[in-house]
Amino acid sequence: MEAEDCTVAVSEANLKDLLLALDVGNTNTVVGLFEGDKLRTHWRLTTHAERTADEVGMWLHQLLRWDQVRVDDLTDVAVSSVVPPMDPRLAEGVRRYLDKEAFFVEPGIRSDMPLSVDAPQELGADRLCDAVAAYAEHGGPCLVLDFGTAITWEVVSAEGEYLGGAIAPGPGVTADALSSKTAKLPSVAMEPPPRVIGKGTVDSIQSGLFYGYLGLIEGVTRRMLDELGDATVVATGGLAQAFASHTDLIQHVEPDLTLHGLRILWQLNRGEAG
């Protein structure tokens, strides 16, 4: 399964917009620069929740300089964050150094996607971005898996209604717990070993983690498809390609799905459509 470019058309009026998009996760922050609907470049950086507003602002300013973008040419800044303590400092850093009031994905924004869940205000920003982007690109019904610090599943109906999903600890969380809670088991890279039956400690751990998670992924996905019926299955996140190459359930791998969802939500709320 090859990674795909997720590009959703926008109005001609927005083709020259320069949007800086920040997907702030618990482990990594992905920063993307959009020119209209095209992702011009992106950077993946470690998330540091204790960053000050000045650090955030200088950090973003330097990324723009690296890509030879003048601050005055930037149209706006959009943020999807699952690290609430960072949000005020992100907003202040953007205000001071980029002279913008950042758009945040938060409860109450326009998404054009009905949220048929018990507590819509609790839906994570990244999960909404994933659902919106997958539906815009593939229509519905669709099911999205995002491999991050947590693994999330998002389900969207044929009519574009968000139906809910599931959340499980990600492979990295489990691997860290295993090495930190045991005296003799080492930390290992999350990758498929050469065989399922391990011949040593490292490949035995890799087998248990990788194929154990593969079973989790396939099990939850199949049960969701049993409830939903046939659907397009899309994966994103750091380990999406690795797992997609070992299962026939995942039809599309789109590494930049969350950023594209953030772009779409920004356009609905502040762009030409807003």
Positions of PLM-derived features:
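Conserved phosphate-binding catalytic cores of ATP/NTP-utilizing and phosphoryl-transfer enzymes
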Residues: 2, 9-16, 112-142, 263-270
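Short glycine-rich, Thr/Ser-proximal phosphate-binding strand/loop in the N-terminal lobe
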Residues: 2, 8-10, 14-62, 160-187, ...
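ATP-binding/phosphotransfer module of carbohydrate and carboxylate kinases, centering on a glycine-rich
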Residues: 2-10, 15-21, 174-274
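Short glycine-aspartate micro-motif
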Residues: 19-23, 78, 142-146, 234
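Glycine-rich phosphate-binding loop of actin/hexokinase-like ATP-binding domains
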Residues: 44, 140-176, 232-233, 251-257, ...
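Short, well-ordered amphipathic alpha-helical segments that serve as non-catalytic structural scaffolds
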Residues: 55-67, 216, 220
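Short beta-strand-loop/turn "lid" adjacent to the catalytic site in phosphate-handling enzymes
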Residues: 67-123, 159-166, 170-171, 199-210, ...
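Glycine-rich phosphate-binding loop signature in dinucleotide/nucleotide-binding domains
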Residues: 69-72, 137-139, 224-228
